[in-house]
């Protein structure tokens, strides 16, 4: 079942994203390379991207019981993950966008939202815009992507280590 919401939205009276790192079950972390997020083995010589996370301000307008709807971004450079159909396939992309602008938008920005589900110590991130498609990783050095092949060939389970 779903855990309680692991993210804070108010620190010192103002909305503030949480920050952390993501790594898959093969101990591969996310890094920013060539305008994409790719996975590489975790080591002391690798600096993972800092992910930024904010829950959707209006979750009541989205499907219930699918997890916590979140915006997922990175720092340095400030970009957000979003899903778009490219050549007939749901595709995971990065876009220069401020996570707080998405949060304050008067309605949910579905292409930028993911249902976060935590089971035990691992998390999955399902696209709100493309239900049944999850953020996934595969081989070292390859970009993260969307897949509908849940648990078949690709890793859709991640460890989310919140630092704030």
UniProtKB/Swiss-Prot annotation:
Gene3D superfamilies: 2.80.10.50. The keyword Zinc does not apply. Pfam families: IL1. It is found in: Cytoplasm; Secreted. One of its GO terms (molecular function) is cytokine activity. N-terminal truncation leads to a dramatic enhancement of its activity (>1000-fold). Proteolytically cleaved by cathepsin CTSG. Disulfide bonds: none annotated. Residues 1-12 form a propeptide. InterPro entries: IL-1_fam (IPR000975), IL1/FGF (IPR008996). One of its GO terms (cellular component) is extracellular space. Its main location: cytoplasm. The keyword Zinc does not apply. Belongs to the IL-1 family. PANTHER family: INTERLEUKIN-1 FAMILY MEMBER (PTHR10078), INTERLEUKIN-36 GAMMA (PTHR10078:SF27). Interacts with cargo receptor TMED10; the interaction mediates the translocation from the cytoplasm into the ERGIC (endoplasmic reticulum-Golgi intermediate compartment) and thereby secretion. This is Interleukin-36 gamma. It comes from Mus musculus (Mouse).
């Amino acid at each position: 079942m779903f855990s309680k919401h692991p993210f804070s939205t108010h620190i010192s009276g103002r909305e503030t994203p949480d920050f952390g790192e993501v790594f898959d079950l093969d101990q591969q972390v996310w890094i920013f390379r060539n305008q994409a997020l790719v996975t590489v083995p975790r080591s002391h010589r690798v600096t993972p991207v800092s992910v930024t996370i904010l829950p959707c301000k209006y979750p009541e307008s989205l499907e219930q019981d699918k997890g916590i709807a979140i915006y997922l971004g990175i720092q340095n450079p400030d970009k957000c993950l979003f899903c778009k159909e490219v050549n007939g396939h749901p595709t995971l992309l990065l876009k220069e966008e401020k996570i707080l602008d998405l949060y304050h938008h008067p309605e949910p920005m579905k292409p930028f939202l993911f249902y976060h589900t935590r089971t035990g110590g691992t998390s999955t991130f399902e696209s709100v815009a493309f239900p049944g498609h999850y953020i996934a990783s595969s081989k070292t050095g390859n970009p993260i992507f969307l897949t509908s092949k849940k648990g078949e060939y690709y890793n859709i389970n991640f460890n989310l280590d919140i630092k704030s």
